[in-house]
Amino acid sequence: MKALKIIGLSFIAMISLGTYAQELDANLQFRPRYEYRNGFKSPMSNGEDATSFVSQRSRLNLNFKQEKLKAKLTLQNIRSWGDVSTTATADKNGVAVFEAWAQYDFSPNWSARFGRQVISYDNQRILGEIDWIQQGQSHDAALFSFHPKNHQLDLGFAMNANAENLVAPKTPYTTNYKSMQYAWYHTQFGKINTSLLLLNTGYEFEKSVGNLEVDYKQTFGTYLVFKDKKWDSNLGLYGQTGKNFNNNVSAWYAGANLGYALTDAFKASLGYEFLSGKDQDNTSLTVKSFSPIFGTNHAFNGFMDYFYVGNHQNSVGLQDAYLKLNYSLKKWQFTLTPHVFNAPNTVLNASNEKMDSYLGTEIDFTLGYAVQKDIMVSAGYSQMFASATLERLKNVTDAGNTNNWAWVMISFNPKLFSLK
């Protein structure tokens, strides 16, 4: 807390000594969340017990603006209640930098941003903030943006190392990607918003003893959004090619959603996603499984995180058909989303026989209540009805009959001050 006070006072001093028009906004976020996990991410085996815990995010956000200069600093502490003693002299995770960037606006249409920053576009299927996880997701990157009226072109660049090395390391860098470049373009044609993305990610690996190489994988595609008075829809199409650990990549993704507002308070949507995969009896070394690399994957394919949240990589792919029902009433919001999952590629049992493609059904229910402007209470309950095929994919034997997950979260977002 002493460090945070010093930082805050330093920013205030900058304001008082400045000679230009300046703005400084400071706000906090405290977000404790209780979770009950009984088959979260994978079916529970008989004999295993459910678990529960409380995690918390605590953030300080500072936003600075001075004519053509903008800057943001976000510090955070992520903890599980009880991970340190009540008399601890140091925190387990300490205070970390979530965002720390500066931006210069060359003109109303051109800007450049450097530093630790969130990179998030469209529906966050490929590039997202992952706000659900307490730590979120941010990148060390440079961003150049050209944004005249009705158009935006962003060019991003990143290169990573594990330290200020004096010579080239002898072991591969595996903390993250070694390098990344992307171009994102957005425009509007009437009622259709169109985005194009080209993303190039390079991962370092040891090809042979003492021989480090970087393989590059390309993700490219489009995201379209249509909105009318009562109708809205979106369509995402992406492909992946390149190399992954010296293996060729050939994968693709398609996702679509169609929504209709029956009343001002009630909306229904139908959606479908296809993520390519590979038959388990396919001996080819080609990577055919699509990977939503930096996406906010918790928001897709069920909230119980059975797919693509640190799992289900280089697997049989996924088909997800879902119905989403939204209802709002004054300060309340309710959402019910059933998902039906299928494997688009062959799954084999222990006898190498083809199994049924049906993976299971998940039902997600969430609600939210706005206590006041800066306080939000939300909760949810999810249940997965897993098939034998899904249990096989998750390598679970003797699975229990009930797999469910429940959570309650409170978000406090008070504004400390705003100086102009």
What are these regions (language model features)?
Residues N246-Y253, S269-G317:
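C-terminal outer-membrane beta-barrel translocator/porin domains of Gram-negative envelope proteins
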Residues F40-S42, S85, I126, N165-P169, ...:
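Outer-membrane beta-barrel and related beta-rich outer-membrane complex signature
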Residues F98, S138-D140, Q181:
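Envelope-exposed proteins and targeting segments
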